[in-house]
């Protein structure tokens, strides 16, 4: 099949030769000079626009460096700004709806401090667990769950599949 297409393409090429660039006048030196001139003018215009935008932006930025009406101001590392003085009173917590924070007891903290005297004999305090009971109770498996959650787990316990 490929050789039929190749033969047909060769016959069409011999029968109808392709148009040459010379017949359209594209190799005329006057046309080349005209296109070169257009390209040169385009390059000059683009370069002028680029330089104008670059230099006008830097001059404009220097003039309006710290305008109070601007949404964003650039950082000025040469000038040091002072922070607001924090109030010594307890601040209102926005996460608690503006209410004052109450002082927490050390026992209410999320993390407890390590007690080094107990850490010296850490492995001696680890006890061995008894053997778990197997059966319907699952009490050892669901330690620390409420009775409602335990009932849900018991109801959803995997059931054996019927043989096929």
Curated annotation (Swiss-Prot):
Transmembrane domains' residue ranges: 31-51
Subcellular location: Cell membrane
Residue intervals on the Extracellular side: 22-30
Highest rank taxon of the organism: Eukaryota
Predominant cellular place of this UniProt entry's protein: membrane
Sites of Blocked amino end (Gln) modification: 22
Sequence segments annotated as region (Disordered): 87-111, 124-143
Family matches, as Pfam families: ITAM, TCR_zetazeta
Topological region Cytoplasmic: 52-164
Example GO BP: positive regulation of protein localization to cell surface
Tissue specificity comment: CD3Z is expressed in normal lymphoid tissue and in peripheral blood mononuclear cells (PBMCs). Expressed also in retinal ganglion cells.
Record PTM Phosphotyrosine, positions in chain: 72, 83, 111, 123, 142, 153
Keyword annotations of the record: Adaptive immunity, Cell membrane, Immunity, Membrane, Phosphoprotein, Receptor, Repeat, Signal, Transmembrane, Transmembrane helix
Observed effect of gene inactivation: CD3Z deletion causes severely defective thymocyte differentiation. Absence of CD3Z also leads to altered dendritic structure and motility in developing retina.
Record note on domains: The ITAM domains mediate interaction with SHB.
Function according to Swiss-Prot or TrEMBL: Part of the TCR-CD3 complex present on T-lymphocyte cell surface that plays an essential role in adaptive immune response. When antigen presenting cells (APCs) activate T-cell receptor (TCR), TCR-mediated signals are transmitted across the cell membrane by the CD3 chains CD3D, CD3E, CD3G and CD3Z. All CD3 chains contain immunoreceptor tyrosine-based activation motifs (ITAMs) in their cytoplasmic domain. Upon TCR engagement, these motifs become phosphorylated by Src family protein tyrosine kinases LCK and FYN, resulting in the activation of downstream signaling pathways.
Family: Belongs to the CD3Z/FCER1G family.
Protein name: T-cell surface glycoprotein CD3 zeta chain
Gene symbol of the encoding locus: Cd247
């Amino acid at each position: 099949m490929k050789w039929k297409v190749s033969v047909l393409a060769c016959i069409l090429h011999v029968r109808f030769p392709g148009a040459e660039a010379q017949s359209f006048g594209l190799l005329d030196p006057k046309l080349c000079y005209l296109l070169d001139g257009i390209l040169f003018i385009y390059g000059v215009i683009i370069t002028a626009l680029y330089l104008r935008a670059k230099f006008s932006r830097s001059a404009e930025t220097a003039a309006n460096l710290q305008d109070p009406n601007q949404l964003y101001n650039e950082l000025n590392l040469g000038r040091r700004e002072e922070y607001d003085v924090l109030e010594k009173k307890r601040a209102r917590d926005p996460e608690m709806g503006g209410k004052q924070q109450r002082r927490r007891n050390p026992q209410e903290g999320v993390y407890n401090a390590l007690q080094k005297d107990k850490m010296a004999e850490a492995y001696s305090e680890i006890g061995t667990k008894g053997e778990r009971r197997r059966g319907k109770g699952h009490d050892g498996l669901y330690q620390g769950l409420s009775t409602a959650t335990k009932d849900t787990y018991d109801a959803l316990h995997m059931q054996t599949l019927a043989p096929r």
